[in-house]
Amino acid sequence: MARIAGVNLPSNKHVNIALTAIYGIGNTTARKICSDLQIPPFIKLKDLEDIKLDELRESVSKLIVEGDLRREISMNIKRLIDLGSYRGLRHRRGLPVRGQRTKTNARTRKGPRKAIGAK
């Protein structure tokens, strides 16, 4: 198992799939990293040479991933809440932020239904 950005990557998977195990790297970014470093995307991570693995580590270290990205996202949400903006208010109340309807279909964001006592 290769360790990149503090994450143990599965060595039996293809390089571009294994890179998506890092928070903040999706399919598109993984493919771009592979093409920039001229790594065939369908080679297994365990078959990768140490030199290429070091280049991969260096390339990923230039991106904002894992803890730094999580911290940045939470700071952005905290900033919206502190500003008192509409989006911050929706975050604080645990409701959908981007204009979705809430009369129906907001169960994921609102959580399970709260029972109203019978009379």
Swiss-Prot record:
InterPro entries in alphabetical order: Rbsml_uS13_C, Ribosomal_uS13, Ribosomal_uS13-like_H2TH, Ribosomal_uS13_bac-type, Ribosomal_uS13_CS
HAMAP family cross-referenced by the UniProt entry: Ribosomal_uS13
GO cellular component: cytosol; small ribosomal subunit
Molecular-function GO terms, alphabetical: rRNA binding; structural constituent of ribosome; tRNA binding
Function: Located at the top of the head of the 30S subunit, it contacts several helices of the 16S rRNA. In the 70S ribosome it contacts the 23S rRNA (bridge B1a) and protein L5 of the 50S subunit (bridge B1b), connecting the 2 subunits; these bridges are implicated in subunit movement. Contacts the tRNAs in the A and P-sites.
Region of interest (Disordered), ranges: 94-119
Pfam families for this protein: Ribosomal_S13
The family this protein is said to belong to: Belongs to the universal ribosomal protein uS13 family.
Compositional bias segments (type: Basic residues): 94-113
Gene transcribed to yield this protein: rpsM
SUPFAM superfamilies according to UniProt: S13-like H2TH domain (SSF46946)
Any Gene Ontology biological process: translation
The protein's name in its UniProt record: Small ribosomal subunit protein uS13
Organism: Nitrosomonas europaea (strain ATCC 19718 / CIP 103999 / KCTC 2705 / NBRC 14298)
Keywords carried by this UniProt record: Ribonucleoprotein, Ribosomal protein, RNA-binding, rRNA-binding, tRNA-binding
Subunit structure, as described in the record: Part of the 30S ribosomal subunit. Forms a loose heterodimer with protein S19. Forms two bridges to the 50S subunit in the 70S ribosome.
UniProt entry tagged with the keyword Ribonucleoprotein: yes
